[in-house]
Amino acid sequence: MSSSIFEMTIDHDGMDSTGLKLSQTASSISMGDEFLCSSTTSNSILDSPLPKVTFNHIDSITDINTNIMNEIVEPQSGVDVDVADKNVLYCIDPYPVEPPCYDFANPSKVIRYPIYEHCRPCLTSVKPPSYTPSVEHYTVVSMKMEKLSPFENASSRLWNNFILQINSTQINFYSIDDSLTRHIKNYRGGDMFDHSHHSKTASDRHHSARSLLNAFTTKSTYQFDKYDKERICGEIARDEHKFLSDERLFKSYSLQCAKVGLPIDYSSRDFVLRMRCEGQQFLVQFSHVDELIYWAMYLNMGISLSLDLELREMPTYRSVPRRRHPRARRFKQHNKNKNKNKSRQNSDRNDSRSHSLLLRRSHTSSVVTKVATGNERPTNKSRSRSLSLLPPSVSDASHDSNGPNDSGSLAGESSQTDFCGLFTSKLRNFFKTDSSSRKNSNMDIGQKMRSKELNSVQEEIDDNGSTTNTNTSVLSSTFSPTAHSVLTAQTSIHENFRSRSNSNPIDPLRCDRSVLKINNFEPVYEGTGRSTISNSAERTNREEKLNRGNEDVNGDEDDDEDEDDANYEEDDEDGYVEDDDINRLVYLDERESRYENADVEYGTIFSTKSFSVTGCLNHDFPKKLSLKCGNKNQSSNDSKWAPATQLVSRKRYIKDSLRCIKPLTEDHPWVGKIIFKPALPPAFETNNPPIRVYSGEDSTDLMHVKNHYLKPYIVGSCGFLKTGSKLFHFYDRTNDLTNL
């Protein structure tokens, strides 16, 4: 549409201007003419002519009559406004509007939108997919009730065995069927675990009093181990409807506003978690440390999913393990350095004492051997396994190989015998550990042998395998190089233990590196005249170098652990887990893994033809050294641009996992927290009715009912308070709740 510029001119030179003149760039028209507007798309906007206006002589534009201006502005009554609006819209978009094509609406072929043009309506017979829980697992546990409510302690604090199941947002405890425990001799699942109790719900107090009385007269509850758990869970997986039926339900808890954590104040049993559900507090014991870590994760997932979306908070998981307190850490590091300095001073003092003691022992043993007959065998029960396997002719052959018996040869041989006897006791003390707190009094002999210390495994081999190994082809009636290498290796190992016994106690988790590398001994053959111990000075220097290398390796390992701990974020908001508790669980896991492989390892070692003490000791600890010393021989460029993957040891994995679990003590505050209590269902019918197991409609114990209804309360100082929906956002903040 063409636009024109209008300007109003007035002639003051004596000319009578009888009208306003409109000047245009290309042409000019007068006000009296008809105002027409041409366009390429429409004929005209205003078809009616404008009114003609005559002016007298005016001095300024302000003298114009306002009525005349209103007449110019206001349109005539005959003009249709709707028609004019339609014409304007038609000028803007004359063509009909249609939806664009998908190619123009989405030019990018990467983004794809679903097209439902050819969809058919769903039939009424088609059902939606079945429900699948977010978290679903089960295992065998032992449970101990601590509190029936925040204001009432449990009358019966006995352990009872159950099948624990987590079904998304609730946990269920089922009684264990007798067919699952028939392989366990004298099994006892606890006094509360009684099938007759399911039919008599009115005698709860009498039952708890009777259970407290029977605690002093009956046997302890059986504690499941890893093998029992795997076998029982395998049988449950074959028939879940039978073993996880509603008739076997003992209790059902909702995970809404529940809490779970490590009971750092409880040390009677291992692998235990403390839980708070529906106002009750109880302990749950698992079979091993891996199961404890997994179930802590499962329970936290269920707690995060339990509340509604509008009431749910962002979960605060501990994905980074917390370090211990800096004050306690500095104190521990100071004592560690202090003990290192003392051990170094004591080692220098004891070197001379050990040397003189060895000389006195050798002289005394030489006098004793002169009195004893040559064919008499020692009957001491504490002699080494290797010497007991040798026939009597071995000792005679050792005398004859060096000519006539003199005091020096007798002293050397008696010192070897004494060394080997002491080596056996040292080796047994090396693997000896504290008595386990998880002993079962009603276990059979095979299970007791497997669950005791490693020394019991060795004694069992002594009793059963001594007669069979003496007839093997390894130990002949004559003196053999293999037997002599055994004696030589035992003598060297004993000297190393003897020199370090007073200064540095042996740690069962860290083997001495000098013990691991005893592969350079040369066997002495008959008639060669070589000494049984080759050049003691060179061997002493080699052992000192290996000992220094072992100290460096252990120091590097401690430094690596300290550096890892220094990178941990310190957070004391919810407390921290004591290192003693974590180290205790780690130690139990390492001991249990050692028991699992004890029968296989020692059974195969002592039955092979190339038996040696070196192979026996090298079997348990090569992986630890290879992880620490593997990257030192690589070039700098390879380690910089293609670094080797750092394998996390199992000990570090367990420590980090346990530090990520928040602690929960028995006296953790209840006041100000929101809990859910079981409530009666509404009067109207719902689509999710509660599942009653064995109780009648008049039962008051709603925890024996699946899908029972809940009602929120605030724990006060003297009782429960009613709560509203606003408080759910602050259910974990005590100060905000108490100030409302």
UniProtKB/Swiss-Prot annotation:
One of its GO terms (cellular component) is mitochondrion. Residues 318-414, 525-576 are annotated as: Disordered. Gene3D superfamilies: Pleckstrin-homology domain (PH domain)/Phosphotyrosine-binding domain (PTB). Residues 553-576 have a biased composition (Acidic residues). Residues 320-343 have a biased composition (Basic residues). PANTHER family: PH DOMAIN-CONTAINING PROTEIN YHR131C. To yeast YHR131c. This is Uncharacterized protein YNL144C.
